[in-house]
Amino acid sequence: MSKPTITVIVPVYKAMATLDRCVESIVSQQTEEPIACILVDDGSPDDSGKMCDAWAARDPRVTVIHQEDRGVSGARNAGLAAAGSEYIVFLDSDDALRPGALQAALDAQRRAPHSLVCWQYTTEEADTAPVTSAAE
């Protein structure tokens, strides 16, 4: 696999209910550049770590770091230390990217290279029904 342009770092702790949706939304992104996903199992006491390992076994773009609980900042920092890409995206394990989100972010960054790229979001309940949306 060639060096990724974008790495998505996901801290994982007690995320069994949401992890598959999160990772699927990452690995299904259509991008012109290679992407990677780093799942940081932050000492989760449930089977979230095993779920991370299963994703890594299925998709070579997914890697897993297992560590003792260091909190979300410690997990993000571990992911940053392991990433070797030009761009970093942080995603929480209960989040999901919309189709095309990574390519849109990459395009926006390249149009304005000294900028921070942010995008809109939708808050959903457990049944994934939209509740609120951020302004575009």
Predicted regions and their residues:
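Nucleotide-sugar donor-binding/catalytic module of glycosyltransferases
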Residues: 1-136
